[in-house]
């Protein structure tokens, strides 16, 4: 088990009766293989990744992204007081209840969010990034018109009051080629408008090859790398590195429906590959996921610093 990458690739490509192992099996098995390689060689998991990809070991934290679930007000207060780097996800997955038929509810929420940060922060240097997942709902209220979608998204910038704003999944075009085309048109229109709001790809961007295709098309500013969807965790490393190399911001995400083990493993992957941000997980209670990810990251950084 000395070599993680060789073993991970073997099981990621293994076919039984003509079929690859389920992505979840490959995801979990590759985590066990990384842990085994670290234990067998007396290294941290982050060190194993750095060594096998010939990356520098950088003992510096990756910005963490807190997700609120539907508790998008109380959870935000917790995030502000704990100084979370990126917030709040917000789960804007319903037009009538959360977005508004003219986008007015999201506009009001972004205004409340920025006001809340500015009034509750304990240090004026705290300047978090706003990252809101809208699950394709903006496209629904603007009839999938990329210009109208972009105009609305650009108008939210003023409500953010100087805080960086990312909108994830503004549209769901129903298939990958159309999704790339729609996101590209929205991104280009935002540039034409001089907007600083950034677009994050989510829907139809699942596998390593999808991430490459969305990146090569310049379809957005950031892609979510949905860690369980890539199978073996070595694919996460490759995806982050591809984004970093080609000027695409990498968001190492995943799902609230993971385990404490996978969350901690993802910390090591992030510390090695260096995405722009990492999702706090598992769960949507926020506190639990923050404790798991924050503590693992800081333990690992402290151990890396002792080896310098």
Question: What residues fall within each predicted segment?
Answer:
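Catalytic core of soluble alpha/beta enzymes
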Residues: 119-272, 279-297
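Structured C-terminal cap/extension of enzyme domains
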Residues: 1, 5-6, 27, 238, ...
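Charged, long alpha-helical assembly modules
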Residues: 84-88, 95-140, 144
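Metal- or metallocofactor-binding catalytic centers and their adjacent structured scaffolds
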Residues: 1-43
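Catalytic cores of large soluble enzymes that bind and process phosphate-bearing ligands
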Residues: 17, 21-29, 76, 93-94, ...
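Glycine-rich, mobile lid/loop segments that gate access to catalytic sites or pores
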Residues: 35-109
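Structural signal for hydrophobic packing residues in well-ordered secondary-structure cores
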Residues: 29, 33-41, 45, 49, ...
């Amino acid at each position: 088990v000395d070599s993680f990458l060789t073993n991970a690739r073997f099981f990621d490509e293994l076919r039984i009766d003509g079929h690859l192992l389920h992505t979840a099996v490959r995801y979990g098995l590759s985590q066990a293989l990384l842990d085994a390689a670290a234990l067998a060689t007396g290294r941290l998991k982050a060190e194993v990744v750095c060594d096998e990809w010939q990356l520098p070991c950088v003992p510096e934290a990756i910005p963490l992204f807190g997700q609120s679930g539907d508790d998008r007000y109380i959870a935000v207060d917790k995030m502000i007081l704990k100084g979370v780097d990126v917030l709040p996800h917000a789960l804007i997955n319903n037009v009538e209840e959360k977005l508004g038929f003219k986008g007015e509810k999201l506009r009001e929420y972004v205004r409340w969010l920025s006001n809340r940060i500015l009034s509750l922060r304990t240090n004026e240097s705290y300047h978090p990034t706003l990252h809101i997942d809208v699950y394709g709902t903006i496209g629904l209220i603007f009839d999938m018109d990329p210009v109208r979608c972009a105009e609305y998204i650009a108008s939210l910038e003023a409500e953010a009051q100087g805080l960086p704003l990312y909108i994830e999944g503004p549209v769901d075009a129903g298939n990958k080629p159309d999704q790339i085309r729609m996101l590209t048109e929205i991104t280009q229109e935002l540039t034409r408008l001089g907007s600083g709001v950034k677009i994050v790809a989510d829907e139809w961007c699942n596998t390593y090859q999808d991430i490459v295709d969305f990146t090569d098309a310049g379809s957005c500013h950031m892609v979510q790398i949905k860690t369980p969807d890539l199978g073996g965790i070595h694919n996460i490393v490759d995806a982050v590195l591809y984004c970093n190399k080609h000027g695409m911001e990498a968001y190492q995400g995943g799902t609230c429906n993971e385990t404490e083990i996978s969350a901690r493993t993802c910390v090591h992957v992030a510390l090695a590959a260096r995405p722009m941000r990492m999702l706090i997980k598992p769960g949507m209670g926020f506190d639990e996921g923050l404790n798991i990810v924050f503590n693992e990251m800081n333990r690992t950084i402290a151990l890396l610093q002792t080896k310098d």
